[in-house]
């Protein structure tokens, strides 16, 4: 990265975004619905109090009977009959309205939307000791977003203080912390709570999350918001454990390691790799970049935000909204180039090749960096400084396949052993296309990881038949190939809130999408996906091993928004409590 961009990674948001928590809402419908139903909830509470009083009298009578009983009663108490009563008392503890797994963008966004809808008794289970999700974990040199900051943020919580058009990871993490403070979310978050099992209890109509330490947390609904980019992935290379030098994954960066003068390799030339290489080449002795497949790289129109922009955004919030809309529609246009094979696809490829030719002079290197697949088939990369970094005197691009790791380095298929002090794995994440990060159990012993062995499927990326009251974020086929993930996320959050309110306000035991509705939805999706660039023949993390696309949404962001705009109750089976 250039000097301006790298310095932005150390910057912090100096002022909080000019939006108040109670003003930050775009959809007041759910909130009004809850307020209107408040009297009914009070009446329900009174009934519950009366029931509790009756229950207490019954318990008192039983206690008196116990005191008056003889040895037979004592024997009865020691045979384990008291234990079920203890368990029953534990189950009577009021469950949360919603269990949210994960405190990254998705989990916090879900919490905000629930609060704005009048639901406050939810709990967020976070496995780490801080919020942030992928932006907490990815702190490698040069880490930044490849979507403009004014689009990679929530529309209901704009930040007029972005320092650059493309912000670094530190600044994005500051924005996430702002969300926690502005919407008073920290009291809802339980840190260091790693969920190991999520099971639906059909009789009670509750979800139970089992934590690593054995504790069970219960909720009427559950939201899986752990995100697809949370588990670091290492390549399946022979001898991985044999290398005696330092091994670092891009998502688990070791800031104590001194790269100065070291012999370093970077494996992986995807989104994280092209950000790491320009930073490491500045300090290492030698840098060897191991490339399996070149990607399409386009320029990044990055610039420092002028102070007058910030002042304008603060004084006239509508001006920032207009900028966001302009960015949104610009990216929507890109869909024609990267999702489908259209005349714009060829235009995009020519622009990318022009970028390559303008920055790389050597013919051999140009050929090695030219993709042989259609643009959009893999993730399009955005960088101004990756190509120049590869041409530094201490850098070398290696395209021979890796045969294995050796104790002192990497051995390639041409028989050369590259001596190294450190290997950086910029190999991305174990994206859950056919499984789940922990067992998720639904009705009648169903397990989501088993059902998704052939590829993940859901209804509108949110609900899965047989798993009532469960809502997914970044679920199957919700990935954008051209626009901001948070645009898609907002549609998911609002849809999930509608479902959760239907369960809570309707006093439902279960709300489960119909199996035939889900199957019909996915047949249509896969038919549309077959015509996209993602399914045009290259190997990418979008697809399973057998070519099933469980990741991307085959359309414009506006089409996804329309899909999520209506909650069709006829698509679900509702079971009253």
Positions of the model-derived regions?
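Rossmann-like dinucleotide-binding core of oxidoreductases
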Residues: 88-95, 99-105, 109-130, 224-359, ...
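Intrinsically disordered, polybasic Lys/Arg-rich low-complexity tracts
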Residues: 3-5, 10-91
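Short hydrophobic core segments
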Residues: 100-101, 195, 216-229, 264-267, ...
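Beta1-alpha1 glycine-rich phosphate/pyrophosphate-binding loop at the start
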Residues: 93-189, 291-294, 358-364
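Short beta-strand to alpha-helix junction loop
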Residues: 159-178, 190, 267, 339-347, ...
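Feature captures the FAD/FMN-dependent oxidoreductase FAD-binding
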Residues: 164-230, 404
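C-terminal active-site-capping segments
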Residues: 487-490, 494-577
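Glycine/threonine-rich phosphate-binding loop and adjacent beta-strand/alpha-helix elements that clamp
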Residues: 422, 426-500
